[in-house]
């Protein structure tokens, strides 16, 4: 939408005037109601909010972007427990509670309790938000992994950081590997704009009655949470419709009409055939619901991936999160050297853009997958997806981990060595995972100078 059109749009579809992003100033001497602005918020449709509403560009941190997304998301319950680099985010959500934008907010005792309480709130039918990072993700994983099977449309923010010793608070997204395989929808934000958009869209997607699953919005720690970037935001006078819990895939708990079953069948499965069958079907339905989320991801955030210059590219970089930002600069440098190269940024990790990748990568000779983790979870997803559909050599790397940075030169070196056959000088971890290569090379190895 053009800047001129944004300036001309002064009302929403209901005819309510749209004010500036800044909070209105109270009259001199007037007694200020801290909840006054929140009370004036008007409900608009998700379609209008995401696709039509005019936006104003602000220069804010990722934590502030998360706050502004929650401000417009009509959240009922937010539960916090501090851990770097997420602490500031939930502190800012507490400010929203003081201003009346979030109905209930408190600090939990630790991550196990937070994830259990968030699950209880969602099970009772209210819209819930929380955030954690690194060791907090792993500590709360038992509760997090239960959300998809119980069909709880929670939105959780994961500000990924190092989890192993020697411990660091710098970005490392190995925790995403755990989240990918528990049944939840997983989105990976590259920057502050993604963080803002994905959180708001997450509530809408998760609560669709043919989905009813939690959404995890991941980012690479400090790179997004504490750095500033431009974010185009809708006016703060608008918000999403409230959660309509009775339209979900499973009934919510009704404390006024006990007893209530937390599971459709006994949680400990015995040898009864019917119990086993019900259990198996329920497990399969969780993953089927995730697949049904594809159409809503396409509708509200514009697709499971974005592609740049891939049509005639001989080399393609596939990345997600902050690695996509580094890769974009690597593409520019490679293009200046005359290399035909494209970039695919993965937005949605679950569901994974299998069909889209196969269509885009059929002609590529080389695929490079840089990551901020040791295990290479994205490279494995890419190699599995393209097996039998592409003859490209797939290089899983460079990989930096334990809080290390990823110089753009590492990515450029992988591209050049992959195309020319010249030995890479990278000391970062990489692995050759497919294509016409020597079988002795198809393994993880540490490259030396």
Model-derived features: positions:
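Peripheral docking tails and interdomain loops at the edges
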Residues: 370-449
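Glycine-/acidic-rich phosphate or pyrophosphate-binding loops and their flanking alpha/beta elements
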Residues: 61-66, 293-315, 328, 332
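Thiamine diphosphate
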Residues: 2-190, 200, 220, 410-412, ...
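Generic long, charged, amphipathic alpha-helical segments
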Residues: 328-360
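Conformationally flexible catalytic loops at phosphate/diphosphate-handling active centers
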Residues: 33, 214-307
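Flexible, glycine/charged-enriched surface loops at secondary-structure junctions
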Residues: 42, 209-218, 299-308, 341-342, ...
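A general structural motif
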Residues: 167-169, 286-303, 319-326, 346-353
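Glycine-rich beta-alpha junction loops
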Residues: 161-162, 219-226, 321-323, 374, ...
């Amino acid at each position: 939408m053009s800047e001129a059109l944004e300036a001309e749009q002064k009302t929403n579809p209901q005819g309510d005037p749209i004010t500036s992003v800044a909070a209105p100033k109270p009259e001199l001497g007037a007694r200020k109601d801290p909840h006054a602005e929140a009370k004036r918020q008007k409900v608009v449709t998700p379609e209008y909010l995401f696709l039509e509403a005019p936006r104003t560009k602000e220069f804010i941190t990722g934590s502030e972007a998360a706050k502004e997304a929650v401000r417009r998301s009509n959240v009922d319950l937010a539960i916090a427990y501090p851990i770097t680099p997420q602490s500031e985010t939930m502190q800012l959500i507490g400010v929203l509670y003081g201003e009346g934008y979030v109905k209930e907010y408190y600090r939990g005792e630790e991550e196990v309790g937070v994830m259990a309480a968030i699950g209880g709130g969602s099970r009772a039918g209210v819209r819930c938000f929380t955030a954690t990072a690194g060791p907090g993700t792993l500590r709360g994983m038992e509760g997090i992994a239960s959300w998809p099977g119980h069909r709880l449309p929670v939105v959780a923010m994961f500000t990924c950081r190092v989890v192993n010793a020697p411990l660091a608070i710098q970005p490392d997204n190995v925790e995403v590997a755990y989240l990918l395989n528990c049944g939840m929808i997983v989105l990976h934000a590259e920057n502050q704009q993604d963080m803002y958009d994905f959180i708001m869209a997450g509530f809408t997607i998760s609560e669709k009655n043919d989905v009813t699953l939690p959404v995890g919005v991941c980012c690479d720690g400090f790179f997004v949470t504490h750095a500033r970037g431009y974010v185009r935001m809708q006016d703060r006078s608008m918000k999403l419709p409230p959660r309509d819990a009775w339209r979900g895939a499973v009934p919510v708990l009704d404390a006024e009409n006990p007893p209530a079953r937390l599971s459709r069948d006994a949680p400990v499965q015995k040898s009864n055939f019917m119990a086993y069958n019900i259990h198996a079907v329920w497990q399969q339905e969780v993953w089927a619901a995730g697949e049904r989320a594809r159409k809503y991801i396409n509708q509200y955030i514009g697709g499971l991936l974005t592609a740049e210059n891939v049509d005639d590219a001989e080399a393609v970089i596939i990345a997600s999160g902050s690695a996509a930002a580094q890769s974009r600069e690597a593409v520019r440098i490679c293009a200046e050297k005359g290399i035909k190269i494209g970039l695919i940024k993965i937005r949605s990790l679950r569901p994974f853009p299998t069909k889209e990748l196969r269509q885009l990568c059929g002609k590529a000779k080389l695929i490079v997958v840089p990551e901020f983790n040791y295990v290479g979870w994205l490279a494995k997803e890419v190699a599995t997806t393209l097996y039998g559909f592409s003859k490209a050599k797939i290089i899983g790397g460079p990989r930096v981990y334990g809080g290390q940075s990823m110089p753009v030169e590492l990515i450029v070196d992988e591209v050049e060595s992959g195309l020319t056959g010249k030995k890479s000088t990278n000391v970062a971890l990489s692995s050759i995972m497919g294509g016409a290569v020597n079988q002795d090379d198809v393994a993880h190895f540490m490259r030396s100078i």
